[in-house]
């Protein structure tokens, strides 16, 4: 057995299966496509589900991949053990109804013993206990020692996930120090102790489990195998953990260099070193696939990983931002197999650094909150911090509960761990229930996805708006039909069509389908999971049957408007890169016949000056009337020419490149104008943030842009008429009016204060005494919170001893304030409790200290009733 580097193992594996007529596919994105069952790709076969289910035709019946994966289910163990990690690569070879056990078992043995040259006396094989077929192949088609084959039960060697495709599996294991193992019991014990490790799982998907629990044989069984690259590397490099594998150790060494810590000298520091080493790999790959830090979904996973790693950097004494610098080491060791990392290097580093800087701000804010909690606990003579507060620090400020515990321990305070765990459990349940229910294989179980894969629709809509074709499929009421008639709605699929199906942010076409005997309105056009073009129709007249000849005609005016908006989106993208910066990446778009919407990565609002410049550049390119050209070329050639590709798109070898003069060049399958002049005009309507690090621009073109400008002009004219001036004088007139209003408001506030002062005497004249405590309470109209507090201060100071509770109805809201002198607090008065009871009458709430509290209410009509309860509440508190 010769030592092999991780990258070398990957290449040898893929080359081996290419030699067995497999198509090598690049790794799919970590962002699942058309699979709502997953947040992130977490297994080698996950992106291939549509091929296994028959929903899509695979590019080849034999495929091999090395798939990047992220799993965070056991993130708490990462770092604490030397084998857990969030990022890993899974190598696999797959058969979609082609070869089966008789081929894959000998191939697996050949690669293991002849390519990797693992010693046969250190290898073991396990099979499902009832799989005699697999046993026979292992014994007769390989030279494995039969004594080294063990039959295990369903728990170990049968792959199933609920209902649907499933089957037995066979695994290959390596002995890492268990001595000679002779029985299955000894084997299981050694495996549990990690002395024998499984490194390759061959799944024989040959059954379909139904709701009755029956295992029905599949007509075309599949092969799905998985070999963890990092685990294989530990064997080939004779190291104990994934953190000692060559490419990963390079990252670990850099962490040690930055922190000044030595690995394997301090158990606590080792945990932090491993966490940072693992997490930066996941972080780098996730951002390269277009995921950005946020508070939900995939973005939340990324933020959690990034902040956890950053916090452990502080634990190691790294006080500056540092994670972005580790990215270079990850990329250097991976870019040959993942070229997108090199292409997006600077972008990845910028995202990481910005999030690190945000966390620095957050952790400081979190410390302030924690210090406030500590004071509150001590003031109330408690010894425990409530679980919900500890969870708030964890969830909102990124404070690991261990860090909170450590700080509290120094203050002699503990955490309500049960309450914290309850909050954590509820959050996980919320996250789990929020995920859309779907079958395991990831595709919605709808008739639209069950259309025969052999039926294909040729799209001819780039240069035609009307074509003749035949009806291939009719769907009505979730059933395949032979015909559909007037008054019904359904779906029609034809063999060719000019209708563009919604894709890439561009809305689907509308129009009509007709012949001499029928007419249907096409109200939408979409694709199913296998790419079939679906015309959603309403039958207006007559009826149509399968194989009928029809004419399909797109609504030309609507299509033209969509074209204008789509081409304008491309020009906008290029203009944003030019003005805002080359970190701008498209993260989403929407194009219809009314407007366009463009989402892009940027970390602050686009300034007014920048927006004006972007708008100016777009209109300048429109006025140039640049030719818009489309060309199909190889993906690599397109990238070399500078064509912009989107993060989450998986492109074929040949791609369609859309160029607008020399200004814009993008990979795109949508419809466009033939020259930019046809767009006419471009106008930005709005710019706003839609998520952390994501901005959105909405805009209109052509006549819609003119309508927008006309609307704005009309508003200006109406405003000028109201202010009785011309449009040139409008700004000066408005400024004058605003200043005048502010002066009037000051006068009004001064009058209110005078009224409040007058109310002071009346309130002091109506003081009540309850159990020896003076109580002043009243409802005062139309004064704000500051004035209400000032009035309360004056009354309390005049009373010298007593309680003051005031309420006010101000601008439709209810305000309350309560104040008490120290001697009344000693008698049991607590303003926080008083204000809570009183405000609840007016539909509000609040609280505060024993000597001062304030609150709000929602129902002004209940103000008087609320104030009437003051005396009763005070009476209940006074000792």
UniProtKB/Swiss-Prot annotation:
Binds 1 zinc ion per subunit. Its EC number is 6.1.1.7. Its main location: cytoplasm. GO terms for biological process: alanyl-tRNA aminoacylation. NCBIfam families: alaS. Belongs to the class-II aminoacyl-tRNA synthetase family. This is Alanine--tRNA ligase. It comes from Clostridium botulinum (strain Loch Maree / Type A3). The gene is alaS.
């Amino acid at each position: 057995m010769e030592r092999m580097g991780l990258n070398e193992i990957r290449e040898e594996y893929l080359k081996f299966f290419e030699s067995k007529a497999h198509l090598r596919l690049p790794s799919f994105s970590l962002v699942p496509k058309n699979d709502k069952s997953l947040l992130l790709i977490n297994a080698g076969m996950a992106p291939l589900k549509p091929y296994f289910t028959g929903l899509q035709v695979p590019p080849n019946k034999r495929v091999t991949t090395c798939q990047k994966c992220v799993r965070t289910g056991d993130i708490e163990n990462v770092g604490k053990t030397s084998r857990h990690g969030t990022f890993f690569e899974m190598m696999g070879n797959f058969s979609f109804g082609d070869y089966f056990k008789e081929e894959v078992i000998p191939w697996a043995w050949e690669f293991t013993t002849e390519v990797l040259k693992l010693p046969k006396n250190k290898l073991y094989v396990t099979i499902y206990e009832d799989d005699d077929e697999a046993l026979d192949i292992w014994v007769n088609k390989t030279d494995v020692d039969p004594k080294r084959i063990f039959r295990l039960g369903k728990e170990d060697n049968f792959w199933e996930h609920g209902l649907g495709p499933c089957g037995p599996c066979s695994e290959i294991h390596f002995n890492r120090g268990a001595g000679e193992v002779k029985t299955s019991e000894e084997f299981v014990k050694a495996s549990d102790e990690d002395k024998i490790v499984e490194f390759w799982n061959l799944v024989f998907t040959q059954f379909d489990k139904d709701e009755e629990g029956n295992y029905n044989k599949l007509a075309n069984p599949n092969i799905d195998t998985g070999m963890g690259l990092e685990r294989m590397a530990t064997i080939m490099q004779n190291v104990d953990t994934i953190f000692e594998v060559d490419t990963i150790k390079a990252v670990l060494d850099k962490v040690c260099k930055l922190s000044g810590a030595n690995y394997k000298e301090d158990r606590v520091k080792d945990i932090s070193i491993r966490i940072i080493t693992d997490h930066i790999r996941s972080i780098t790959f996730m951002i390269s696939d277009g995921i950005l830090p946020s508070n939900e979904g995939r973005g939340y996973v990324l933020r959690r990983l990034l902040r956890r790693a950053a916090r452990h950097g502080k634990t190691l004494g790294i006080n500056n931002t540092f994670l972005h610098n580790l990215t270079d080491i990850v990329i250097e060791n991976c870019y040959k197999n993942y070229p997108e990392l090199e292409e997006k290097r600077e972008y990845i580093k910028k995202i990481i650094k910005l999030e690190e800087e945000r966390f620095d701000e957050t952790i400081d804010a979190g410390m302030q909150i924690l210090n406030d909690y500590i004071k509150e606990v001590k003031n109330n003579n408690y010894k425990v911090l409530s679980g919900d507060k500890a969870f708030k620090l964890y969830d909102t400020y990124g404070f690991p509960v261990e860090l909170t515990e450590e700080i509290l321990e120094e203050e002699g305070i503990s955490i309500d761990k049960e309450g914290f765990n309850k909050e954590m459990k509820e959050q996980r349940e919320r996250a789990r229930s929020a995920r859309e229910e779907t079958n395991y294989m990831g595709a919605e179980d709808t008739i639209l996805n069950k259309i025969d894969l052999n039926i294909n629709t040729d799209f001819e809509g780039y240069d035609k708006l009307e074509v003749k074709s035949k009806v291939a499929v009719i769907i009505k009421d979730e059933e395949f039909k032979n015909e559909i008639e007037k008054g019904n709605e359904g779906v029609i699929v034809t063999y060719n069509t000019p209708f563009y199906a919604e894709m890439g942010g561009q809305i689907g076409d509308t129009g009509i389908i007709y012949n001499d005997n029928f007419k249907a309105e096409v109200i939408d056009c979409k694709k199913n999971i296998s790419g079939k073009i679906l015309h959603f129709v309403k039958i207006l007249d007559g009826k149509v049957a399968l194989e009928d000849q029809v004419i399909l005609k797109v609504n030309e005016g609507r299509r033209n408007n969509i074209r204008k908006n789509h081409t304008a989106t491309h020009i906008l993208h290029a203009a944003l890169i030019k003005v805002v910066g080359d970190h701008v990446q498209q993260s989403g778009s929407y194009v219809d016949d009314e407007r366009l919407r463009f989402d892009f990565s940027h970390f602050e609002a686009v300034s007014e000056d920048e927006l004006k410049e972007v708008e100016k550049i777009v209109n300048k390119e429109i006025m140039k009337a640049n030719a818009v050209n489309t060309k199909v070329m190889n993906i690599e050639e397109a990238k070399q020419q500078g064509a912009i590709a989107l993060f989450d798109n998986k492109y074929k070898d040949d791609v369609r490149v859309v160029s607008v003069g020399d200004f814009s060049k993008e990979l795109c399958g949508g419809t466009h104008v033939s020259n930019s002049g046809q767009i006419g005009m471009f106008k930005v309507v709005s710019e706003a943030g839609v998520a952390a690090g994501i901005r959105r621009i909405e805009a209109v073109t052509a006549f819609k842009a003119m309508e927008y400008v006309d609307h704005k002009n009309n508003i200006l004219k109406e405003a000028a008429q109201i202010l009785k001036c011309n449009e040139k004088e409008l700004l000066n007139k408005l400024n004058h009016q605003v200043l005048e209003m502010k002066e009037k408001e000051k006068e009004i506030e001064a009058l209110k204060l005078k009224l409040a002062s007058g109310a002071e005497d009346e309130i002091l004249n109506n003081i009540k005494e309850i159990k020896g405590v003076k109580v002043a309470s009243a409802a005062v109209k139309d004064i704000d919170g500051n004035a209400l507090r000032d009035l309360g201060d004056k009354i309390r100071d005049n009373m010298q001893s007593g309680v003051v509770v005031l309420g006010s109805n101000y601008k439709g809201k209810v305000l309350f304030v309560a104040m008490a002198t120290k001697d009344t607090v000693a008698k049991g008065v607590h303003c926080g409790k008083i204000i809570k009871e009183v405000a609840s009458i007016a539909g509000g709430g609040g609280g505060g200290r024993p000597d001062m509290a304030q609150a709000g209410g929602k129902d002004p009509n209940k103000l008087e009733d609320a104030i009437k309860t003051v005396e009763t509440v005070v009476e209940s508190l006074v000792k």
